[in-house]
Amino acid sequence: MNTASPPDFHDLHGLLQQTAQRALLLADCRTGSEAEVLERWLQGNLRGTAVENVPQRILLDMSDSTAADSLDRQLADLPDDTLVIPLRVLWLPAGEQRRLRDVLLGNPHNPGSLVQKLILNFSPDRCSPIYAEPATLGTLRAALADQPHVRHLGDFTLRRAVLATKKVERRLRGHRYKEPAFVEDDILQDPEFRADLERIQGEKKSAPADLVAEARKYIKELVPTSTPLGLDLLIRLSRYVYTRGYDQEIMVDPKQVEKLRKLAREHPVILLCNHRSQVDSFAIYSTLYDNDLPHPHTFGGINMKWPIIGNIQRSSGMIFIRRAFNDNPVYKAVLQRYIDYLVSRRFPLLWSIEGGRSRTGKLVPPRYGLLHWLLNAAERYDKTQPLYIVPLSVVFEQVVDVDAYALEQLGGVKKPENLAWF
């Protein structure tokens, strides 16, 4: 499915008026309320169209593990000229100032069935049916031929539908909400990763199934569960943290922000920042969020995976990496292919080039470990689409960590990172 957004993601009527071919309305639908919303919307859009036959509807919960197989069976006998139109219902928060209150009723971006009914009764403007750019089954079947590791047409069509509607969602929610999809499957099906496992199998004399199971474990450990709600909570946390010692307004150069926006829209972008304070990353997160720039996946040591705060960071894109893994070839292979995945799909990445806080308030020599992994990914990336490394400098009037720096310079013991800092 072409993931380019249609001119108007609400005007399904206009799309159907322009086509007289067979149409298949493929809806991502989790609840009865969503099914009712979509059906009412479809009935309104179908009146007076030039469609010769009433479009076929397929309603699936696309997050269900059986959805792809079910879809494949329903697509099997349909002709190539069938136009597949992906649909879904988008739920919007009541507003930034109420988000934390909304959380008491569940995730405002993905509410449960009961909350959906309340929204439809009291705030129907928070419910927005959308559709994404359609494609014919013939086009999808031809594209599937170039994807030998995808199981079947149902799996391929479902993936393309999810990615297409996610792109349209960002036009409504904001570009700050850019979430990966199908990461585990894409890593495990990657030809180079499969070659890595075959090589490791020969070296370790391990059973293939055992290596795949080990890889799945590391994927779950590394890959964050990014959600819009997680990002909203992280930004609230970020503002709380940095406003304890600084003004809420962060001074930035608007021209540089627009330059970064253009780069992030067209290319993979790596943000390398200095790291003099615990506040650094929180200030960067807030600045990107306020300017509707995609939130970066951030690399951090697994020792920073604190209770509560670590969970919020993980749900917003933090990647916690083990401190030592040179003797773990499966972990290394998973990490490399995950970085490949993020770069090839233009997800911004962020980390400190110094590897950690400087401990003195001054810049220290860089550490090149992650940069090495990045360059490996860049070698496999499309050479016609350059990868950009963007240096970020966070400058403070006074660094709040200075007392800890002075104590350490006088011979004091460095305190481990923990929640007490906050």
Language-model features, listed with the residues they occupy:
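Membrane-interfacial terminal anchoring regions of lipid-handling membrane enzymes
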Residues: 1-422
